[in-house]
Amino acid sequence: MMENRNNNNNRDKNPVKRFNKISIGLASPESILAESRGEVLKPETINYRTHKPERDGLFCERIFGPVKDFECACGKYKRIRYKGIVCDRCGVEVTEKKVRRDRVGHINLVVPIAHIWYFRSLPNKIGYILGLPSKKLDMIIYYERYVVIQAGIAQNAEGESIKRLDFLTEEEYLNILDTLPADNQYLDDFDPNKFVAKMGAECIMDLLARINLDELSYDLRHKANNETSKQRKTEALKRLQVVESFRESNKNRENRPEWMIMKVVPVIPPELRPLVPLDGGRFATSDLNDLYRRVIIRNNRLKRLMEIKAPEVILRNEKRMLQESVDSLFDNTRKASAVKTESNRPLKSLSDSLKGKQGRFRQNLLGKRVDYSARSVIVVGPELRLFECGIPKDMAAELYKPFVIRKLIERGIVKTVKSAKKIIDKKEPVVWDILENVIKGHPILLNRAPTLHRLGIQAFQPKLIEGKAIQLHPLVCTAFNADFDGDQMAVHLPLGPEAILEAQLLMLASHNILNPANGAPVTVPSQDMVLGLYYMTKERLTTEGHIILGQDLVFYSAEETNIALNEGRVELNARVKIRAKDFNEEGELVYKIIQTTAGRVLFNEVVPEAAGYINDVLTKKNLRDIIGKILAVTDVPTTAAFLDNIKDMGYKFAFKGGLSFSLGDIRIPEQKTQLIADARAQVEGISGNYNMGLITNNERYNQVIDIWTSANAQLTELAMKNIREDQQGFNSVYMMLDSGARGSKEQIRQLTGMRGLMAKPKKSTAGGGEIIENPILSNFKEGLSILEYFISTHGARKGLADTALKTADAGYLTRRLHDVSQDVIVNIEDCGTLRGVEVSALKKNEEIVESLGERILGRVVLQDVVNPLTNDILVHAGEQITEAIMKVIENSPVEKVEVRSPLVCEATKGICAKCYGRNLATGKMTQRGEAVGVIAAQSIGEPGTQLTLRTFHVGGVAGGISEESNILAKFAGRLEIEDLKTVKGEDGEGNLVDIVISRSTEMKLIDQKTGILLATNNIPYGSSIYVNDAQVVEKGDVICKWDPYNGVIVSEFTGKIAYEDLEQGQSFMVEIDEQTGFQEKVISEGRNKKLIPTLLVYGKNDELIRSYNLPVGAHLMVNDGEKIKAGKILVKIPRRSSKTGDITGGLPRITELLEARNPSNPAVVSEIDGVVSFGKIKRGNREIVIESKFGEIKKYLVKLSSQILVQENDFVRAGVPLSDGAITPDDILRIQGPAAVQQYLVNEIQEVYRLQGVKINDKHFEVVIRQMMRKVRVQDPGDTLFLEDQLIHTKDFIVENDKLYGMKVVEDSGDSSNLKAGQIITPRELRDENSLLKRTDKNLVIARDVITATATPVLQGITRASLQTKSFISAASFQETTKVLNEAAVAGKIDYLEGLKENVIVGHRIPAGTGMREYDHTIVGSKEEYNDLMVAKEEFNY
């Protein structure tokens, strides 16, 4: 064998092993020895004088290989010709030094040692298998107690027989030995009479070796099924899980519990724990060497002590120290007393080198540094084409060096590589010629960190430029999120022909015009370009003071207009007419006379004809739509050329227009002083009301905030109007704002109006951001006073602090999203599911937020969509909804469409193309191999960072609009009001009105002619209603009004008030207002939890008519004994003043939703439809009883401090909250089912992004939520092998149940010898067996039908879902590395390398796109090679 190995050339020595799965398991002592190259006997590393490795030490050359290439330790054999020879003097094999990176040694331990992972981490594997608690296990392992392994005939001091697993002190152990017969210790260990007790890991090894897993599994299953106590049942199930893991793992490979105890410790290769000489004769060493040294020193000392037969006490102490040193070698963080260096830093153990960002997985396997790369500062390249970038010459010469060298040799300019390098380094002119040729058709990749989505790396065709900076095309800046204030970019060079092809066809910048997150163009002109285009297409008319040349001229063609412009006969912004091609009603391109401006004529010269004549002012939003439209009607090259043209045009006209602004362009409205004076007067009026005690302090505060908010809004409107009308809208500031080039309404407001209300500094991040009620009245043009400036600084600094903190959060969110959805790949065309998701327009407060068309565009419909009026089929089942179909559906009365969705896709691996629908980056149907999971994660995560960075744009100014306090009819129509109960009462002005006292009043507004539902609203409890059921209303009529600042409780009856449990100082406090001296009674949470503050209403005959429970914080408006009329407000409950919302609230909200966390004070939700009644109070909770029509009763406990939203005798539906607070996703899943919770999550997350103006397509969230819901929890395992409460993949669950379908379970095997009770057989086998028994008159087999398992769907957070993927490699590289690996090893898991991450880690191509496994056998070649093969095929007929 040895000779053979020497003769083969180097390449065959390590052939690339092809593998398609990886399994993991516990290493047996034999397998460690088989891998090892020798035993490390000495703790020495290298000799301090010769600096050579010590023999048999931790760096020994005989074990690990030579330190120098092809040179043995003593120097007898040098050079490559002796390769493979083992030196007879020093025993070192002559080979390359790199073998020191992969040769492993070992240490033979004198006593077995328990592996820390299996007794210190939870769940405690050894403890669960033996059924011992962790504390007791530690007592055994660290040599504190003896444990009985086999009791034999032993008895304790009282003469009782002892049991297995009894713990004995040393004294008890010795006493028992004294009482035993002398020959007992000479019996065989497995003789039932022998008494065996041991301590330490060898005792555990013995116990584990004696365990019969099958029997233990049977016992535990029996226990789990028949145990009455909940605790013992869960205990049995937990143990069963570990036992089943071992049993399962033995199917694939041998995996024995006693291997959790080690007899041999492997020593990792020395190059992976190097010893580096520093200057000054000292050495820097890896921590692992210290840890190994401690193990070897203690092991050798123990060996010596045993040889000299030292006393037991000393041995035991040494064994315990050895156990501790092996513990810290494997995992130094788990121990209370970690081994530390002199500088008090814990040493890095083997586990630490796997964990975390600096660990093996994330540092070296998932992210590697690459060759052929460069980086430099970027500058703008306005004359580049969209697919080009400028690369400095020197950088290119270095990057393309090998290609240049090859050409130099080919041309015969040089003979050797070395001389070619010299020529390149000298930068001789011939090099540049060759370089120009080499880079043709050889693109490079540009990457800007942070790469948040796939547009962060794009391919460009390089152009050689002078200088040292990379030139970047201005239109791709948006995608890279780059600007030119010193950003740097990295350059990478694709080397192989396949890589070059992929870069050119898939990654070229001109192919990435659309954003994968929402399908809108991402290469959109911004800033100067938009401003220039806006300016050139804006219309200006002649006024007295300003005459526009050439107004209303008529031109025959664009050429004519051009001539007139150049000759100065017509101005750019003049209104003119022109004969040009545009679409008519039928959608055909024809010549017509169009009224337009000279600038627009110029612009339309570069617009492709297929797009018609664009006659609009170009704002950023318009441009985005135009680019999208042009891409849809033409192709990528046309669009790319168009983009380049408008880029040049934009810059040209921004320069020609000279658009900049001065202080004079910022116009402050004259009415400002008057507005502020009015607002101040109103505030004073409110303070007066407050001083007289008419309103509470909270109401006063809320109203003041409202007044200033609306004053500010009015002022902003005035300022905008001013600036809009200045110079016909040619005010530079207004143009920048209106075109979308820079600035926002908010910023204009702060420059010209007033800065407005500011948020109060928070003490903690969790605290509320209240609003300071005195606004900043100055604006930046006038300048701020010292106090105003001081208040402002808080907001500005908060913005910067938030940015720094939140970027990390957003990055972590992206990482979790990637991990959970990385293995979702489009694997098949159609999964054939019959399920879908019903989509309708998304409304908020009756405003349509997202129309039906927008939501279904690019989806595949599940069933035919039919127009309800005409019964025409608008789109057939299985068709994609294109823009054209979308318009048809929008114009029809269809309100709901059922579409395919990733949420319901039934593909076994990944997802199918039909359920996913359109690929947003191309606008066509998704192809197989598309990594949609990663794209979803990027699309959701990328704006996360943007959002976090967006808080500071308006330095802490409190946004918010005045609270709404009424409902107006949005359309004319007929009202239908359901569940309306009212009483007569007085409103704030003392007029008689109807007051609503029902909680679930709903109004529907119906079109009188068609009967179509136009709008629905809930009418709030306590509001004054001005209409009746079936009344016809006009648009704008007031339907109802309410107090926006307070929730109220209104009396339904006339009568007399009595207080119950209302004791001052206990259940309510009297708050005396310092300024007014007015007293208010406010309900507070007292110490006495039994008190339930209640108002009782008594009728005429002193009978109790009604009682009202009062929530904490309610203000009482009536006194004890007061006589009241129906409709009287009894209690006001102040609504919490509006907090300032920024995405700081947004990012944690998204995290909360995606992690499926339950909110801190969740609402109590009804699980059934029924009628409400109130029960007793238990431990500070009020009991709410709901009884359904069918007599089912459910009881709920609601905290007294939370507000109850239902009243006695209300009818509630399942899923309706009974108390205030957020509804938990778990409740929705439990009560309304998986579809409801999926919709809830999608809509809630979208809501957060929508507030920030970020558009993300629903399907990305659906992909992630699909991954969160891929598990079910077993409720009843039936006859399957599942365990109760076990989490399993839905697919596996269905497969197992399907296997059992139609089978039988033997209950009584009768006289059959083949079947046992509990066995699962087919009906056929049962029939055959029984017919055999019948013939011989024996007892027949009795069997019953199989009981299949039942399970409920589970919603897991993205972190949990990532850690529970099928792939242990992916999970380990995510979080909790040691825990994942230790569970995988026990279960002997197999990773089939199906996701992207695990393939990156093992160095395979990812199974997506061109790396899909079915293309593995495809050979890529040239056309000629193919033709040659074809000819051969015909000739030889194969």
From Swiss-Prot:
Q: Which GO terms describe its molecular function?
A: DNA binding; DNA-directed RNA polymerase activity; magnesium ion binding; zinc ion binding
Q: Which cofactors does it use?
A: Mg(2+); Zn(2+)
Tell me the domain of life.
Bacteria
In its UniProt entry, what is this protein called?
DNA-directed RNA polymerase subunit beta'
Positions in coiled-coil regions: none
- Asked if Transferase is a keyword of the record, the answer is yes
What EC number(s) would the UniProt record show? Answer: 2.7.7.6
Q: In Gene Ontology terms, what is a biological process of this protein?
A: DNA-templated transcription
- Give me the comment on cofactor binding: Binds 1 Mg(2+) ion per subunit.
**SMART domains associated with the record:** RPOLA_N (SM00663)
Q: What GO CC terms are in its UniProt record?
A: DNA-directed RNA polymerase complex
- What is the protein's known function? DNA-dependent RNA polymerase catalyzes the transcription of DNA into RNA using the four ribonucleoside triphosphates as substrates.
Per UniProt, Zn(2+) 2 binds at: C831, C905, C912, C915
- Please give the catalytic activity noted in the UniProt record: RNA(n) + a ribonucleoside 5'-triphosphate = RNA(n+1) + diphosphate
What InterPro entries does the database record attribute to this sequence?
DNA-dir_RpoC_beta_prime (IPR045867), DNA-dir_RpoC_beta_prime_bact (IPR012754), RNA_pol_asu (IPR000722), RNA_pol_N (IPR006592), RNA_pol_Rpb1_1 (IPR007080), RNA_pol_Rpb1_3 (IPR007066), RNA_pol_Rpb1_3_sf (IPR042102), RNA_pol_Rpb1_4 (IPR007083)
Q: How does it assemble?
A: The RNAP catalytic core consists of 2 alpha, 1 beta, 1 beta' and 1 omega subunit. When a sigma factor is associated with the core the holoenzyme is formed, which can initiate transcription.
Q: Which family does it belong to?
A: Belongs to the RNA polymerase beta' chain family.
**Binding positions for Mg(2+) per the UniProt entry:** D483, D485, D487
Residues reported in the UniProt entry to bind Zn(2+) 1: C72, C74, C87, C90
